C-alpha cells in the first residue's frame, strides 16, 4: 500500500513538439511515436474526475495544478479550447510552456478567455538572433519574426486584463557556471553548439540583454542549469552530467534512495503522477521513451494503479537504473 498522496500531476495530451531544441532529446530522437496522439476530451475528463473524486483519499485535497508539458507543445493540441473548458469545470489550473511559434492570435484569444485556469505562461526561446534561433530550435528562420510578433501581440492583449496572466521568457543556455569544474552540474560534449561561455560578456548574457531590448517590460531570465534527463543527451554527445553526479551525489551513499526532482513537490517517484497521451502512467519525465510504465488510467482506476505493487516495483527498479543517471536523485545507503 502506498502511504503517499498524489500531490502533483503531469498530463501530456498530445505527445508532439514542432521544435527541436538542441538541449532536448526530441532534437535527436524525435517524439516517441508510440505516444503521439491527441487524447480525446472524454479521456481527459475521465482523469480529472478520478483526481477530483480522489481528493482527501489518494489525492492531496489541495491539488489544483495539472501540468500540461512533457516533451510536447501543448498549443498544438487540436481541442485546446475545449480542454481548457475541462480545466475550468474541475477547478484545475495549468502552466503553459510554449516555443511561441504557435502562440497565434487565435490561441491568444483562447488563453485570455481561460485566464482563470492559467497560472502562468513560460516561453522557451533560446536566442534573440534569427539565424541562431533557427539553429538552436531546428525551425525555419522565416518563423522567427512571426514568433516575436506572437509574443508582442499576447503581451498587448494580456495587459488589457485587470489581472494579467504572468508570462516569463526563459533563455535556456550555457555559461561557465554551468560546468562541473565551476560548481555547475554539466559538461559539454563534442556535438554541443559552440558558444562563448563567459558569464559577463558571453552568448547567454548577450541574449538576455537583446531580449530586454525587444521586450523591455517582460519578465526574462537565463537558465544555465540545463539537465540531461537520465543521460539521453550524453548518448548523442551533447552534454553529460556524469562527472557532476560522481562529484556531488555519489559520495552520499552507494545507491539511489529517493528523488528531489519535482517542481514545488519534490519527489517525482512518491508524490507525482506522469501520464502520457495513451493514459499510461510512468515514473518521471526523465523517462523519455516510456520504459517505466506501471499502469494505465483507463484500464485500471488511478487509485488502484497508485496503490499497486507494479508501481512500487517500478520505483525500485528505476532507483537501480534510470535514476542513477539523474542529477535529481538522492543517494544514500
Describe each PLM feature range.
Residues 14, 18, 256, 320-323:
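Residues immediately within or flanking Cys/His clusters that coordinate Zn2+
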Residues 20, 30-33, 74-76, 104-105, ...:
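Short catalytic/ligand-binding loop motif for oxyanion handling, primarily in non-cytosolic enzymes
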Residues 23, 261, 325:
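Short, cysteine/histidine-rich loop/knuckle motifs that typically chelate Zn2+
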